[in-house]
């Protein structure tokens, strides 16, 4: 009798947590959408915090810290927050007091959650690489809500160490201190995925159908990276060209109708070329009167698309003699854009949900 009771007691001890031990929820799959980031406001200090975090990332600026930090903290962060804040103020979502990137990313998360309603064990959330909500905060929140598996989706169609890799880095950093880590998967870049190319083609066709002019040239403008990064093995340049080529094939256009350029260069280094601003200016000087610009590498409209392209590139083109300019919006939370996100997430969740 004593031995039987002892055996039952030992079995009970193995199946029940120790006294005071917190219960562990399990069985859910977290989906984490991550975009680049946004300041919390347009004033000096919110901009300085955001720019400081962004520009101190070793994946973004690969210069030796002894060279870069005096420039960053001594010059750039003293001057650039005011200038950048003024630019953000032009596109700021004043109704929700946030940048459009945050508005669109939240909407993508909400719509994805609705689309995945058939998966009862899935929780969808979103985060930013720089600024808030942070990857660490949201990752911990998913785990606290019972997720023992997480699919993390860096929202960058083309891979670069400056974007996809640094999001992966930050996500893995969030796991380092955890004793009980979740199983994880990361969604790879998708520069030639049929669902993505189809979404871009539909977006282009729909937008051009609303115009009262026919663009002579359509410019596919991607965010640039320093040429030195590409020489050291970053595949971004080739993947951008591949995306443009697939879109061009689907539309039946030639290489003069749809061209690839790169924008947003920063600092003294040579970046990927041709540069967008110089290209639209030269097109106008060469007699082209009507163009359209699309940003295939941006999942959501943001400062670089709404201000740098829709405003500045438009002005540059017209001042050089151009007449008609249109910016084709990013996929954002459109039906086509959400089809891309949902399709890739369902594929990567295979076997989990």
Swiss-Prot record:
Organism domain of life: Bacteria
Organism of provenance: Chelativorans sp. (strain BNC1)
Top-rank EC class of the record's enzyme: lyase
Residues noted as binding Fe cation in the record, renumbered to the chain: 223, 304
PROSITE patterns, per the entry: FERROCHELATASE
Name listed for the protein in its UniProt record: Ferrochelatase
E.C. number: 4.98.1.1
Family under the similarity heading: Belongs to the ferrochelatase family.
Role according to the record: Catalyzes the ferrous insertion into protoporphyrin IX.
Primary localization: cytoplasm
Catalysed reaction equations from the record: heme b + 2 H(+) = protoporphyrin IX + Fe(2+)
Pathway the protein contributes to: Porphyrin-containing compound metabolism; protoheme biosynthesis; protoheme from protoporphyrin-IX: step 1/1
Gene Ontology cellular component list: cytoplasm
GO annotation, biological process: heme biosynthetic process
GO molecular function term, any single one: ferrochelatase activity
UniProt subcellular location: Cytoplasm
């Amino acid at each position: 009798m004593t031995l039987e009771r002892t055996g039952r007691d030992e079995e009970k001890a193995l199946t029940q947590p120790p006294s005071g031990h917190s219960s562990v929820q399990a069985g859910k799959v977290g989906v984490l959408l991550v975009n680049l980031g946004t300041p919390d406001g347009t004033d000096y200090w919110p901009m300085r915090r955001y720019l400081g975090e962004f520009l101190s990332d070793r994946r973004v600026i690969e210069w030796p810290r002894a060279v870069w930090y005096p420039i960053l903290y001594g010059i750039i962060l003293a001057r650039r927050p005011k200038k950048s804040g003024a630019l953000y103020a032009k596109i700021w979502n004043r109704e929700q007091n946030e940048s459009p990137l945050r508005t669109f990313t939240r909407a993508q998360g909400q719509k994805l959650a609705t689309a995945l309603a058939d998966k009862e064990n899935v929780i969808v959330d979103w985060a930013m690489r720089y600024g808030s909500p942070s990857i660490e905060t949201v990752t911990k929140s998913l785990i606290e809500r019972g997720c023992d598996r997480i699919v993390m989706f860096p929202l960058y169609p083309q891979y670069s160490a400056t974007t996809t890799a640094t999001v992966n880095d930050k996500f893995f950093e969030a796991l380092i201190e955890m004793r009980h880590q979740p199983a994880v998967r990361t969604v790879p870049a998708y520069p030639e995925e049929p669902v993505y190319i189809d979404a871009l083609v539909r977006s282009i066709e729909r937008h051009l159908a609303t115009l009262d002019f026919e663009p002579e040239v359509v410019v596919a403008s991607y965010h640039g990276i320093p040429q030195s990064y590409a020489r050291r093995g970053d595949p971004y340049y080739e993947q951008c060209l591949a995306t443009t080529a697939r879109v061009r094939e689907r539309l039946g256009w030639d290489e003069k109708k749809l061209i690839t350029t790169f924008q947003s260069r920063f600092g003294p280094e040579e970046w990927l070329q041709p540069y967008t601003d110089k290209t639209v200016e030269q097109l106008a000087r060469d007699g082209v009167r009507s163009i359209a610009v699309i940003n295939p590498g941006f999942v959501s409209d943001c400062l670089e698309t709404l201000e740098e392209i829709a405003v500045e590139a438009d002005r540059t083109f017209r001042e050089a003699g151009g007449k008609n300019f249109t910016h084709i919006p990013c996929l954002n939370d459109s039906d086509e854009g959400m089809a891309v996100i949902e399709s890739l997430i369902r594929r990567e969740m295979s076997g989990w949900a």
